[in-house]
Every structure is written in structure tokens, then in C-alpha cells.
């Protein structure tokens, strides 16, 4: 009889540990998904130097620390790109040290987006590739501050 109780206790402990580990896995997967980065590709008019992307969610959460946002990297055929967090729902494209910019552009959260900026700073949005250029894989960027005497 004692052995039977011990088996039940061990079975319950095993079941509880499985439940806890599965909760951890689900939480980790959700966190990883919320940190997923989505490509934003932009075509700007001639004369828009050093274009940048400012991005935020409807709840006011900013994707970047400060204006003018993330500088776009050259792609091909006059296109530029950057990555934004999957929660982004609004984008402003600006350039020439923020002297020119679009209005806020509503985009679908979690979808790669292609934005074409016209000469009058209006923008059109597409969720289908507008260039044959291959977007490089996301690589996290961070600032390193160093003191060198």
C-alpha cells in the first residue's frame, strides 16, 4: 500500500513539473514573438538625403529612442530598408536632417511593408514586394559608449 501512495505522489509531482515547464515554454514563445522584427522598405524622392524611419504603436509605444528614428540602409533600385518591432502600426519617413517628412502612415502590425514616398511627401503602402532586391537578415544594432583616456 505504501508503494502505491509513493507512485501516486511521484506521478503528481511529475505532472506538476510538466505543467510548469510548458508554461515557461509558452511565455518564452510569446516574448520571442513580441520581439520579432519586421522589415520596412522605403523609396524616397531624389534629394531626400539620409532617410530615417520613426515608428510607433497606436498605444504610443515608440519603436526607437529618439527622433528622427532609425536611419534607413540602402537596398537596391533606390529602395532603403530598416527593421521595426512587430507591434508598429504607424510610420513617419523623414530625411535631410528631418527637414522633410511624411505624415503618419498607418500600417498593419506584424507585416513587412513597402512605402513609396512621392515628391509631395505623400506615401503609398504595399504589402507586396516592390523590388526584386533581397532584404538582408535582421541584425540587432546597439550603441556602445566607451571612455578612452
Model region roles, listed by residue range:
Residues 1-12:
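Positively charged n-region of N-terminal signal peptides that target proteins for export
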Residues 46-85, 97-106, 148-149:
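Aromatic-rich carbohydrate-binding modules that target alpha-glucans
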Residues 36-44, 142-146:
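A short, amphipathic beta-strand motif
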Residues 97-129:
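Structured interaction patches on ligand/partner-binding surfaces of diverse proteins
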Residues 20-34:
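Sec-dependent signal peptide cleavage junction
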Residues 87-91:
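Exposed beta-strand face motif in extracellular beta-rich ectodomains
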Amino acid at each position: 500500500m505504501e508503494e502505491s501512495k509513493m507512485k501516486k505522489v511521484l506521478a503528481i509531482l511529475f505532472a506538476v513539473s510538466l505543467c510548469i515547464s510548458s508554461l515557461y515554454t509558452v511565455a518564452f514563445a510569446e516574448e520571442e514573438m513580441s520581439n520579432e522584427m519586421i522589415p520596412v522598405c522605403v523609396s524616397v524622392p531624389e534629394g531626400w538625403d539620409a532617410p530615417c524611419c520613426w515608428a510607433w504603436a497606436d498605444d504610443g509605444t515608440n519603436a526607437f529612442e529618439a527622433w528622427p528614428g532609425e536611419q534607413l540602409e540602402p537596398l537596391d533600385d533606390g529602395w532603403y530598408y530598416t527593421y521595426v518591432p512587430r507591434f508598429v502600426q504607424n510610420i513617419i519617413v523623414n530625411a535631410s536632417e528631418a527637414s522633410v517628412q511624411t505624415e503618419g502612415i498607418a500600417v498593419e502590425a506584424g507585416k513587412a511593408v513597402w512605402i513609396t514616398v512621392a515628391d509631395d511627401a505623400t506615401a503609398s503602402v504595399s504589402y507586396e514586394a516592390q523590388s526584386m532586391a533581397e532584404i538582408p537578415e535582421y541584425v540587432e544594432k546597439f550603441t556602445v559608449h566607451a571612455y578612452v583616456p
